[in-house]
Amino acid sequence: MTDYNLTHLKQLEAESIHIIREVAAEFERPVMLYSIGKDSSVMLHLARKAFFPGKPPFPLMHVDTTWKFQDMITFRDQQAAKFGLDLIVHINEDGVRQGIGPFTHGSAKHTDVMKTESLKQALNKYKFDAAFGGARRDEEKSRAKERVYSFRDSNHRWDPKNQRPELWNLYNGKINKGESIRVFPLSNWTELDIWQYIYLENIELVPLYFSAKRPVVERDGTMIMVDDDRMPLKPGETPMMKDVRFRTLGCYPLTGAIESTATTLPEIIQEMLLTTSSERQGRVIDHDQAGSMEQKKREGYF
């Protein structure tokens, strides 16, 4: 008998496809959370592979804070149209009416109202019982201890001290009425794995991941791109054109750019091989307080 050996990327791919198919078969109303970033793009690619030549048997859902980069929204709509996907876009209209925003109310309040509460609204509205997310364990310490099947109570809260064991590739999806799970098919991937897979599979991405001259201002050691005229400039503050790109994407006022000349996937991968910092250092929301990500997840965040 000939041994059949998979590369580590093909092993990760097979594991993720298995998880996606398992959830589609086991739950009544799954949904794939689509944040438009590189991890979401890989997860969507895996979902399309899992059910090819058919379409994924669940919709995509984007929780729109109204503060995403303009390039992200354009890319989102292009991808949905290109692949004929069922796309749900949910906005917390109560937050919009209150004028909640990162500049007027701060990152913590903005994230809570326009992301966490908005997500919970959407999950309740459409009665989804399983939601795929693109989080990875190497991103941040609270995500490192979260299971692939992450159970949430009827209020969508996560209890890190009450997680089910996951042995090998066996997942327990039994839930009580009103409960739900968040599912993370990319849990065991690293940032470098993601970039190598994108290169291998020729996956399309938002242009913001590639270096270009962009208008930025530096605030508290973070380079923030001026994406539209809603961003108030401080006295004496003038946007400077710099060669920058983004390792992670979110709301533009809360996402820091990095100086880079990497304009191609091989150049980005080369940068990843040399970097010693986390991609989430550019996320302002992660610096709100000690353990802020775990607290957000306990409250129902992605």
Curated annotation (Swiss-Prot):
Q: Which UniProt keywords apply?
A: ATP-binding, Nucleotide-binding, Nucleotidyltransferase, Transferase
Region (Disordered) residue ranges read: 280-302
The encoding gene is cysD
Describe its partners and assembly state.
Answer: Heterodimer composed of CysD, the smaller subunit, and CysN.
* Cited function: With CysN forms the ATP sulfurylase (ATPS) that catalyzes the adenylation of sulfate producing adenosine 5'-phosphosulfate (APS) and diphosphate, the first enzymatic step in sulfur assimilation pathway. APS synthesis involves the formation of a high-energy phosphoric-sulfuric acid anhydride bond driven by GTP hydrolysis by CysN coupled to ATP hydrolysis by CysD.
Query: What InterPro entries does the annotation carry?
Result: PAPS_reduct_dom (IPR002500), Rossmann-like_a/b/a_fold (IPR014729), SO4_adenylTrfase_ssu (IPR011784), Sulfate_adenylyltrnsfr_sub2 (IPR050128)
User: What family does the database annotate?
Assistant: Belongs to the PAPS reductase family. CysD subfamily.
Q: Which organism is it from?
A: Hahella chejuensis (strain KCTC 2396)
Q: Looking at the record's lineage, which domain of life comes first?
A: Bacteria
Q: In which pathway does it act?
A: Sulfur metabolism; hydrogen sulfide biosynthesis; sulfite from sulfate: step 1/3
Q: Which GO terms describe its biological process?
A: hydrogen sulfide biosynthetic process; sulfate assimilation
GO molecular function terms listed in the Swiss-Prot or TrEMBL record: ATP binding; sulfate adenylyltransferase (ATP) activity
Q: What is this protein called?
A: Sulfate adenylyltransferase subunit 2
Q: What's the Enzyme Commission number for this chain?
A: 2.7.7.4
Q: Which reaction does it catalyse?
A: sulfate + ATP + H(+) = adenosine 5'-phosphosulfate + diphosphate
Q: Which PANTHER family has this protein been placed in?
A: SULFATE ADENYLYLTRANSFERASE SUBUNIT 2
